[in-house]
UniProtKB/Swiss-Prot annotation:
Quaternary organization: Homotetramer.
Keywords for the protein's UniProt record, in alphabetical order: Lipopolysaccharide biosynthesis, Magnesium, Metal-binding, Nucleotidyltransferase, Transferase
One Gene Ontology term of the molecular function aspect: glucose-1-phosphate thymidylyltransferase activity
Protein name: Glucose-1-phosphate thymidylyltransferase 1
Gene Ontology terms describing biological process: dTDP-rhamnose biosynthetic process; O antigen biosynthetic process
Cofactor section: Mg(2+)
UniProt function note: Catalyzes the formation of dTDP-glucose, from dTTP and glucose 1-phosphate, as well as its pyrophosphorolysis.
Cystines in this chain: none
NCBIfam families: PRK15480.1, rmlA
Length: 292
């Protein structure tokens, strides 16, 4: 099986969240008990991806490095690259060309939170595809606010539209994408859109026109949370808090995922829990490894 590398795009200026984000990256803001970046990082970890590139702004990259380090504490290999200006999501593949090398890749947006019991299974199908691309569609009430995908009974995309006035479906394309290695050359050959950006929708459209774009449906029982407004930040935190308090289980806890995936052993979890043992997060980790 081919290696698949991951990219987290955590750039942007977060102007919609000013003044909150005037001095700190949006992706470092708390979503209940964790920094926002933990959630997309956990999504890639659940897909079994351990080589991950974090792309951010020149001013925020050192802060991500301070928080996450080289990833070895979780059995990961984290690298960092700067996106000098936000010139579109597809630019991630140009910035990450050297990191991706000859491998397939996955891209997740740093402000997208995914939740669902079968999410790892859904991603496994995308990971194991030999070629082509997979996007993840989520049913929304207001599709005109998103990139909208229409697909046939086999899950093959037949149309893609960006914020259409008359949507052909209620399925929005989420901020999680799996691509074969062809994506790098596609991104390098893209022309900027009318708003001057290299659009991810244009990449997806190329795959669709080639008949190589699969759509994985996030149906009932999944949550996709976008955190672009003050209100949605509160809603995301409340959602995570409700689940964690009700079940007594953490959502998107990198230490737990790394341990369950066999990236690290119980002894390493203990080391990571030690500085946190006075709070609920650290106590959760210590409780988790009891019996190991």
């Amino acid at each position: 099986m081919k290696t698949r590398k991951g990219i987290i795009l955590a750039g942007g200026s977060g102007t919609r969240l000013y003044p909150v984000t005037m001095a700190v990256s949006k992706q470092l803001l708390p979503i209940y008990d964790k920094p926002m970046i933990y959630y997309p990082l956990s999504t890639l970890m659940l897909a079994g991806i351990r080589d991950i590139l974090i792309i951010s702004t020149p001013q925020d990259t050192p802060r991500f490095q301070q928080l996450l380090g080289d990833g070895s504490q979780w059995g990961l290999n984290l690298q960092y690259k700067v996106q000098p200006s936000p010139d579109g999501l597809a630019q991630a593949f140009i910035i990450g060309e050297e990191f991706i090398g000859g491998d397939d890749c996955a891209l997740v947006l740093g402000d997208n939170i995914f939740y669902g019991h079968d999410l790892p299974k859904l991603m496994d199908t995308a990971v194991n595809r030999e070629s082509g691309a997979t996007v993840f569609a989520y049913h929304v009430n207001d599709p005109e606010r998103y990139g909208v995908v229409e697909f046939d009974d086999n899950g093959t995309a037949i149309s893609l539209e960006e914020k259409p006035q008359e949507p052909k479906s209620n399925y929005a394309v989420t901020g999680l994408y799996f691509y074969d290695n062809d994506v790098v050359e596609m991104a390098k050959n893209l022309k900027p859109s009318a708003r001057g950006e290299l659009e991810i929708t244009d990449i997806n459209r190329i795959y669709m026109d080639q008949g190589r774009l699969s759509v994985a449906m996030m149906g009932r029982g999944y949550a996709w949370l976008d955190t672009g407004t003050h209100q949605s930040l509160i809603e995301a935190s409340n959602f995570i808090a409700t689940i964690e308090e009700r079940q007594g289980l953490k959502v998107s806890c990198p230490e737990e995922i790394a341990h369950r995936k066999g990236f690290i052993d119980a002894e390493q979890v203990k080391v990571l829990a030690e500085p946190l043992k006075k709070n609920a997060y650290g106590q959760y980790l210590l409780k988790m490894i009891k019996g190991y």
